[in-house]
A protein has these predicted regions:
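Conserved short submotifs of the Hanks-type protein kinase catalytic core
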Residues: 111-126
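Activation segment signature within eukaryotic-like protein kinase domains
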Residues: 148-149
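Catalytic-loop of the protein kinase fold
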Residues: 160-176
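Conserved catalytic-loop aspartate of Hanks-type protein kinases
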Residues: 222
Length: 277
């Protein structure tokens, strides 16, 4: 979706916002940087809006027919599922969980698609900080890892106390403010712990523990994934078993590294870590 189309879409709900650029995108939607201008002070502020497009295929209609469900009811159930996931995030009260400023769902009249719009603070993903920190000293890398650990562990504490697993902890889902604070975001695939949906089909296997292969995992999966993120921060932004920086990484290297980790090979010490850490 281009910026002009996006502007037309959100003007129905948030006429004070103007989409300025695309911040990033992936499987679960596109994030747009937006601006709003205070009518009294004329001060311009930044916000972000994530747009998730949910497409409905002929197979969806066939599945609804097989189950004896009117497609309109099926469509509304999918809509409610997405909105409930956002409500979970809104209900999680932590200074280190991305704050939701508003959300809505916009339906296509023919039920061919559904747009979920989430309005939030404009932040920078941790993986976008890589160029500025790739050549950090061990002391600088340790300081960054410690700050990320403290902030995101606080966010996970609140999640797990409320029975919510994030299930996709990775640098792209850890966000940084201009003041250097970190926030946990992108709960688009979070589930209540009782639901235990497949992590391998939703999360990022690069940061997942071995237990996801059997589906036998709990809140500790989030902690493990965060641990791998922290490992990379003190290993020149590379995961375990990959070639040492600055040697180029091939797809084969990544496959071998993942195989070693999933088979329980002890992790080598990170190469940019202080002795104290």
């Amino acid at each position: 979706m281009d910026t002009n189309t996006f502007n037309n879409l959100i003007s129905q709900t948030w006429p004070d916002l103007h989409a300025a650029s695309t911040l990033g995108g992936g499987t679960f939607g596109t994030v747009y940087a937006c601006t709003k201008t205070d009518a009294v002070t004329s001060v311009t502020q930044k916000e972000a809006v994530k747009v998730v497009r949910v497409d409905f295929t002929p197979e969806d209609r066939a599945n609804a027919d097989e189950e004896g469900i009117p497609f309109a009811d099926y469509y509304r159930a999918v809509k409610e599922k997405h909105l409930q996931e956002i409500r979970w995030m809104v209900a999680l009260k932590s200074p280190h969980i991305v704050h939701i400023n508003g959300y809505t769902a916009i339906e296509e009249p023919d039920h061919s698609a559904l747009y979920i719009l989430i309005r939030m603070d404009c932040l920078t993903a941790l993986d976008q900080l890589r160029p500025a920190h790739l050549n950090d000293t061990p002391e600088q890398a340790a300081a960054l890892a410690e700050k990320v650990a403290l902030d995101i562990c606080d966010a996970l504490r609140v999640c797990h106390q409320n029975g919510v697993l994030h299930r996709d902890i990775k640098p792209a889902n850890i966000l940084c403010s201009d003041t250097g604070d970190f926030y946990l975001g992108d709960f688009g695939i979070s589930k209540g712990t009782a639901q235990q949906a497949s992590m391998t089909s939703s999360g990022t296997l690069e940061y997942a523990p071995r237990e996801v292969m059997t589906g036998q995992y709990d809140h500790r999966a989030d902690l493990y994934s965060l641990g791998l993120v922290l490992y990379a921060l003190v290993n020149h932004w590379r995961g375990p078993f990959l070639p040492a920086y600055p040697v180029p990484i091939t797809p084969g290297d990544r496959n071998q590294a993942q195989y070693a980790r999933m088979n329980g090979t002890p992790l080598p010490p990170p190469d940019n870590c202080t002795t104290a850490l």
